[in-house]
Amino acid sequence: MKKIALFGGSFDPPHYGHFALCTLTRELFSPEKIILSISKNPLKGSANAPEAHQLAMAKLMAEELGKTGPVFEVSDWELRRAGFSYTIETLRHFHAIEPNAELLLCIGEDNYQIFEKWKAYQEILQLAHLVVFARSGTQGEQQSSRIIPPERYTWVQLDLPLSSSDLRREIAEGQDWQAKMPSSIAAHIAAHRLYQNEK
């Protein structure tokens, strides 16, 4: 069966941690495509960079990833909708486009831990197989598997020391941050003075 992996997020900004997740997903599951869907998360509030720059940086990320194989694409469907994004609506959208494909929903352990707070999470489990990325050594799988049948998720452990929130702080404080992302994204951030007013 055709597989399509979906990464939802603000990518605010994208960094090499995101790249590692995307390339590992391709290696482990061999999806026909990996969609980077720019989202407005109702549990996290508004993004820091304007939406146009979020989209531009995600496209730069897809271009860099595309150098390793033509698998990656960007969707702005969630951005173009009014209000916050809910994962169930995004999954319904892509399921309608690809009704015969298996959807892989890639999430972090932090979202896995609060999965029961997600809108229509039972339907999410019907529409998609979860791929949960967790830091090595955590016990989150045992803590949260009570609501997710074991056949509906795959637990992947790896170490990702990078985070977008830390990067935004480092940029605002004038620290050395450029090496943590591809040069094209770093150049975009510098040219448009993004995250300069972060506190």
UniProtKB/Swiss-Prot annotation:
Disulfide bonds: none
InterPro entries: Cyt_trans-like (IPR004821), NadD/NMNAT (IPR005248), Rossmann-like_a/b/a_fold (IPR014729)
The protein's annotated pathway: Cofactor biosynthesis; NAD(+) biosynthesis; deamido-NAD(+) from nicotinate D-ribonucleotide: step 1/1
Signal recorded as keyword: no
Example of a GO MF term: ATP binding
Keyword annotations from UniProtKB, A to Z: ATP-binding, NAD, Nucleotide-binding, Nucleotidyltransferase, Pyridine nucleotide biosynthesis, Transferase
Reactions catalysed: nicotinate beta-D-ribonucleotide + ATP + H(+) = deamido-NAD(+) + diphosphate
GO terms of biological process kind: NAD biosynthetic process
EC number: 2.7.7.18
Listed Gene3D superfamilies: HUPs
Superkingdom: Bacteria
Family: Belongs to the NadD family.
Free-text function comment from the UniProt entry: Catalyzes the reversible adenylation of nicotinate mononucleotide (NaMN) to nicotinic acid adenine dinucleotide (NaAD).
Record NCBIfam families: cyt_tran_rel, nicotinate (nicotinamide) nucleotide adenylyltransferase
Name of the protein in its database record: Probable nicotinate-nucleotide adenylyltransferase
Organism: Chloroherpeton thalassium (strain ATCC 35110 / GB-78)
